[in-house]
C-alpha cells in the first residue's frame, strides 16, 4: 500500500513472481524479495498481505480487479511479452511450401496490428484504472533500475549480451 517510484522503494517489498529463476533474480536485483505464487492465488495474496506487489500488464491488472487490493501501478517497462506462433518441426515439414509461405506472410502482416492493438488496449486499461482511483506511477530514475539489472543481464544474457547493448544504445 505504498507507491514505488525510486529503486530504494523496492527494498523490503515482497513481490510475487512466476516460478522461474530469472524472474526471481530480477526482483531480487531490484532489492525486493521474490515470492513464487501461482497466478490463481495472486488476488488473495495481495489482499492478505502475503505479498506487497506483483507484475502484470495493465489489462490483466484491470480485468482481474487487482486495483482493489493494490492501488498503485508502476509503469516500469521491465518486460515486453511478444505473441509468438509456434509450429513443431514435424508439422512444418509436412506443410506444403505454399502454406508455409502463407503462414510466414500472415505473421509478418499481423505484427504491427498486434503491437497497435496491445498499445490501444493498454491505454484504455490505464484510463479505466485512473477512473477506479489507481495511482499510476513511473520510475523517477529509470537508469538506476536498468543498472540494478546488470547482474541479471550477465547471468542470463549469455551470447546475447552484444544485442542487449545495441538495444540500450538505441534507447
Task: Report residues per predicted region.
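N-terminal secretory/targeting leader peptides
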Residues: 1-171
Amino acid at each position: 500500500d505504498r507507491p514505488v517510484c525510486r529503486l530504494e522503494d523496492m527494498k523490503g517489498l515482497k513481490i510475487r513472481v512466476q516460478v522461474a529463476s530469472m524472474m526471481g533474480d530480477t526482483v531480487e536485483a531490484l532489492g525486493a524479495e521474490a515470492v513464487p505464487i501461482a497466478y490463481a492465488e495472486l488476488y488473495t495474496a495481495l489482499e492478505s498481505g502475503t505479498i506487497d506487489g506483483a507484475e502484470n500488464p495493465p489489462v490483466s491488472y484491470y480485468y482481474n480487479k487487482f486495483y482493489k487490493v493494490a492501488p498503485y501501478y508502476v509503469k516500469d517497462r521491465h518486460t515486453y511479452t511478444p505473441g509468438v506462433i509456434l509450429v513443431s518441426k514435424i508439422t512444418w515439414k509436412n506443410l506444403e511450401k505454399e502454406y508455409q509461405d502463407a503462414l510466414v506472410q500472415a505473421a509478418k502482416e499481423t505484427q504491427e496490428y498486434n503491437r497497435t492493438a496491445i498499445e490501444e488496449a493498454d491505454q484504455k486499461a490505464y484510463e479505466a484504472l485512473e477512473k477506479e482511483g489507481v495511482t499510476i506511477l513511473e520510475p523517477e530514475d529509470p537508469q538506476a533500475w536498468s543498472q540494478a539489472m546488470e547482474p541479471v543481464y550477465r547471468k542470463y544474457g549469455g551470447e546475447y549480451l552484444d544485442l542487449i547493448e545495441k538495444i540500450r544504445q538505441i534507447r
